[in-house]
Every structure is written in C-alpha cells, then in structure tokens.
A protein has these predicted regions:
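Bacterial N-terminal signal peptides that target proteins for export
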Residues: 1-10
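Hydrophobic helical h-region of N-terminal Sec-dependent signal peptides
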Residues: 10-16
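C-terminal motif of bacterial Sec signal peptides marking the signal peptidase cleavage site
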Residues: 19-22
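Compositionally biased intrinsically disordered regions enriched in Thr/Gly
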Residues: 24-47, 51-316, 330, 361, ...
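Acidic, small-residue rich beta-repeat scaffolds with periodic aromatic anchors
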Residues: 54-87, 255-308, 390-581
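Short, flexible beta-strand-to-coil junctions
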Residues: 178-183, 264-270, 327-334, 341-344, ...
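Acidic, glycine-anchored loop motifs typical of Ca2+
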Residues: 307, 311-333, 367-374, 460
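A short beta-strand motif characteristic of beta-propeller blades
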Residues: 351-357
Length: 581
C-alpha cells in the first residue's frame, strides 16, 4: 500500500514535489566495472566525447531551439490521468476513489488521423466502463456509510488503473492497463490490453501478429516453467486451446520491440496463491512465427518493465546467453497497524541485482548501441532518474539526475462531495525523442522541461539550450529587477529595462544555469496562499503557459549553484520560492 495523500489540491502537491532545498546540480556518474583509476577517467572522457557528438548530431535537427518536426512516423502518446474521490462530508470520509487513464495523441498529421480516431473510440468505451464502475461503488458506499454510522471502522474502496505504452512506432501501438482494486475484502489486480495498427487505426487481434499460434504457445509452455519453476499450473497452450475458439478474445497480450507478451491473472492458469504469470516470447527466438510487419527491426528501443512479475530475456553482458531481467517492488509492514508500504525497488539482470530506495517508481529497459540500460524514474523526497548499465549492475556507482518524465499540466476541482484531480503525463516510447523535466542549477526555482534523446552511452541528452517551465510557479519581486526584453527565439529587443518591485512574474522558459524568461501576470491569474510568513503563487489561468510573445529575460550570477543578481541572493529578490526543509 502506497503512502499517498489524496486530499491535497494537485497544484499544491506538484509545487511541493518540485521543491528542492539547498540542492546543487548533480554530476552524472559513470557506471563502470572494477577498474583502475586511470581506466575510469578514460571511460569518463570517452563518455564526454560521445555526449558532445550526440548533441551535435541532434543540434542539426533542432536548430534555433525550434520544436522538432516528427519525420519518423512514430506516434507519441500522452496519458491523461484522472482521479475521482467520492467523499462523505458528514463523516469526513472518502468512500471510494477511481483512477483511470485517457489516451491522447500529440501528433496532428493526417497520417495519424485513423489512430487518433481509434483513441477517441477507446476513450468513449472507457466512459461507459466508468459509469458501471461508479454505479457498483455507489452500492458498496451505502454499506460503508451504514458501517460508519454503527461505529465500525470503514475501509476506503478503490479502483486504480495505470497504463503502460508497450510500443508506439509506425507499425503498432500496444497498451497494457494494470488495475489494482478493492471492493471491500482485499486488494486484487487485473490486466487488460488493446493493440492498434498505426497506419489504419484498426484494433489488432492476436492472430494478426502471431501467425503460428501453436508454435508460440509451445514456446510459452517452456518459458513459463523457466520463469515460474516453483509452481504447478496449467500449461499456457492448454488455456490457449480453449481461447482460440473465441479468436483469443479474452487473451491479454501486447506486442513490444522485444516480442509478444501474454498475461495471465491470478487464478487463470493456477490457484489464486500462485499469483499471475507474464510470459514474453522474443522475435529473435523464432521470427518466422510472427507477422513480418510487426517484427521490430530497429537496433535501439525502449519498453516499460512492469514491476512484480514481468521478465524479459536479453543478453545484457555479451556472453551469448540470455539473462533474466526484471524489477520487483520492495515492501515493509508496520508492526502496529499492519499497513504495508513501498520502501523501494530492486532491479535484477542475470546474477546481478541492485536496490533503490523510493516509495514509487517506473522502470524502462533501454537498448542503445548494443548495450542494455534500466531507466528508473523514482520518487522519494524528490524525483530522480537512475540510469543503470545492466552490464555493470553491481558497481557502486550509479548515474543519476534530478530528472523525471514531463507533466503537461495538473488541475484540481471539486463539485459537491466529489473531487477530481487531472494530470497529463508524457510517455517514454522513443529513444530519439521524449520529454523530461530536469533540475539544473535553477532547480531551486522550478524544473525545466526539454526534449531529450538517449545518447550512445545510454544516458539522456538534450540539444536544447533552453526549455519550458510548465510547473505554474509564480513569484513576486521584492526589489526592482534589471533585465532585457527578448523575443521568442531569445533575440534582444531592448537591452536595458527593469521589472519594478511588487510585480508578479511567471517564468515560462529558462536554461539550466543562467537565465529565465518571464511574463508579468495579474493576481486574477493566480492562486495565492500564505505560509511561513510569506505568500506563494501558483497559476490558475493555464492558457498563459502557451504564451508566445516577448519576454523579460532575468539573468543570474551563478556561484556553484548559488544564484544572485548583482550580489543579492534570490531569496531577497523574489517572494514565493518554495523549498523543503
């Protein structure tokens, strides 16, 4: 059970989450084996040279800091996470919560119109399912209220779905929905999937991708006893025999860059106590059993690794033998309350493993330049990315950054006893282009959103000099601030101007170390609250995030991460800087 506060407005949660107290910009640490000091320095130098080459290569694509035009034919997907809380004000109780995810397509091109239409139909079907879920929960909630009125302790009911984009390229889009739910007895899990042909938007059936299903399930029989050798369950091929009569309508499956994965919930192949089974058959194990169109042919890829029971078999160390790669959640139990909560995640690659402390996270397997990496986007006190080289997983050194996948926007509203939290999340499906929020030296003020790519050394790189500020954090100037006036591209229009004391400013662009581009805003555009003897400001007029006019550029002096203007510390210049601790 995750320790989360569901009753805080999401805007405030986002601001606090992004807060950093006295944090310096981290150094990206090289992941190396047990080498001598000289060898380590040599590897570090090679990495820096590779990074520079990677950035130069991408700078040609992204000149003048303009948004990259999608020429790859790959769709990029946004996830619209929505959380509903149904409360009873009289008893101050949350009766139930429902979390669900809509699909949105970032691209507007005509070639993506069929896929966009399929997403719209998917979202409509989701609304119908939600209506039935609410109806069921309303019935359970009446029992909850009755228990509360009689003095019994109530348990919050919930249904929470996380969506994973297993593949999104010019041939296929594959989505896995993982739902955790409790209708009053105990926590349970279920999975659903849907797969699309990118060109036509057509929903793919299992036999559209796996043309020799008999051979596929024979391989699955062998794999299930490799990955789940300690349990005695029905063979996947026996289950498939009955499922084929309905054209595998009830089979949960996805297609990824690695291969095709089938998912069996607890109780399907065995007893409830046997847990679920997730089996992946790779394309390169027997390419002939798959439809050629959907066999992934590129050398680089990224796929999500769902923590708990998904195992992928790849050769991580180049010895010609496939290694089992998987991720597990780590838990502890409070001895008094018996509540179970996350304490971290553990990554396995063959005989190697490593633990990472966090209370939640997402894992992605990345293949780049013949090597395998695990990207661990985790959240503890702050959000971090650990980039783990699976060849050297036992190494003490780990490459980490104050980095996370981007959040487009977050909103909260309340109607009667129902609260709604909405956030639009970026996804990581393309090694050539993904959006992430990074804390540079200006991280004490806000995160910076940039377009990134995976470099040849496996770490995220960006050719953008500056990025967007989408957190909606605003400040009030405590003194006159000298600045320059610039246009959208950063060309100076007026070199000597100032923002007067008492002005409300909203940062919209910034680079990692030196400057932020701001606009002035009115109090009507903001939510203003008091705390610790000062006021804090967050944006409510979200249209301002899309402003494209001229800006005031405020330039800082940067002394190893300590920011000032003409020797005056930023805390004496701006009101509303949120810090932790």
């Amino acid at each position: 059970m995750r320790n989360k506060k569901f009753l805080l407005p999401v805007i405030f949660s986002i601001l606090v989450m992004f807060s950093l107290a006295s944090c310096k910009s981290p150094v990206s640490v090289n992941i190396v084996n047990d080498n001598t000091e000289g060898e380590t320095v040599s590897k570090a130098t090679d990495r820096e040279e590779k990074d520079e080459d990677d950035v130069k290569k991408h700078e040609k694509k992204n000149k003048d800091n303009k948004k990259l035009i999608n020429t790859s034919g790959k769709p990029h997907i946004l996830l619209k996470d929505t959380m509903e809380l149904h409360n009873d004000d009289e008893s101050s109780t949350t009766l139930y919560r429902i979390k669900y995810v809509y699909l949105q397509l970032k691209e507007d091109g005509k070639e993506f119109e069929p896929l966009k239409k399929s997403f719209e139909n998917y979202n409509k079907d989701l609304l119908d399912k939600l209506s039935k879920t609410r109806e069921a929960f309303d019935g359970f909630a009446k029992e909850q209220l009755s228990d509360i009125q009689q003095g019994y302790e109530s348990k919050e009911l919930f249904s929470e779905t996380d969506s994973y984009i297993m593949r999104a390229d010019k041939y296929a889009v594959s989505i896995l929905n993982y739902t955790k739910y409790n209708y009053g007895a105990s926590d349970k899990y279920s999975r659903e999937s849907i797969n699309f042909d990118t060109d036509t938007g057509k929903k793919l059936e299992f036999l559209d991708v796996v043309k020799d299903d008999k051979s596929f399930f024979e391989m699955a029989d062998k794999r299930v006893y490799e990955d789940y050798e300690e349990i005695h369950i029905q063979k996947p091929s026996e289950y498939a025999y009955t499922s084929k009569k309905n054209n595998y309508e009830n089979l949960v499956w996805t297609v990824s860059p690695v291969g095709v994965t089938v998912y069996f919930d607890s109780g399907v192949l065995g007893a409830e106590t046997d847990g679920p089974q997730v089996i992946t058959i790779s394309f390169d194990e027997n390419e002939t059993i798959f439809e050629p169109k959907y066999v992934y042919k590129e050398n680089e890829y990224v796929i999500p690794v769902v923590a708990g029971n998904m195992t992928i078999h790849v050769d991580t160390d180049g010895d010609g033998v496939r290694d089992s790669v998987f991720v597990d959640d780590l838990y502890e139990q409070n001895p008094e309350t018996l509540d179970i909560y996350n304490t971290g995640m553990k990554v396995y690659a063959g005989t190697q493993s490593i633990e990472i402390e966090c209370y939640e996270g997402k894992a992605y397997l990345v293949k780049m330049d013949g090597n395998y990496y695990m990207y661990m986007f985790v959240q503890d006190e702050i959000r971090l990315l650990y980039c783990l080289d699976l060849k050297y997983l036992k190494s003490e050194d780990r490459s980490d950054k104050y980095f996370y996948l981007g959040t487009r926007e977050g909103t909260w509203d309340q109607k009667g006893e129902i609260e709604n939290y909405v956030s639009i999340e970026e996804t990581f499906t393309d090694t050539e282009s993904f959006v992430g929020e990074y804390f540079g030296d200006l991280g004490i003020l806000f995160p910076i959103e940039k377009e990134w790519f995976v470099g040849e050394d496996g770490t995220p790189q960006s050719s953008d000099d500056k990025g967007r500020v989408t957190s909606g954090i605003a400040f009030r100037t405590l003194k006159d601030i000298k600045c320059t006036e610039v246009d959208r591209e950063g060309k100076v229009k007026k070199s000597d101007t100032k923002i007067v004391k008492g002005t409300l400013i909203l940062p919209l662009y910034a680079n990692d170390k030196e400057y932020m581009d701001v606009i002035t805003v009115d109090e009507d555009d903001l939510n203003i609250w008091n705390g610790a003897g000062e006021e804090f400001f967050s944006l409510t007029n979200m249209k301002l995030l899309d402003y494209e006019g001229d800006f005031y550029r405020i330039t800082f002096e940067n002394d190893d991460g300590d920011l000032s203007i003409d020797g005056t510390d930023i805390f004496d210049l701006f009101e509303g800087i949120i810090t932790a601790g």
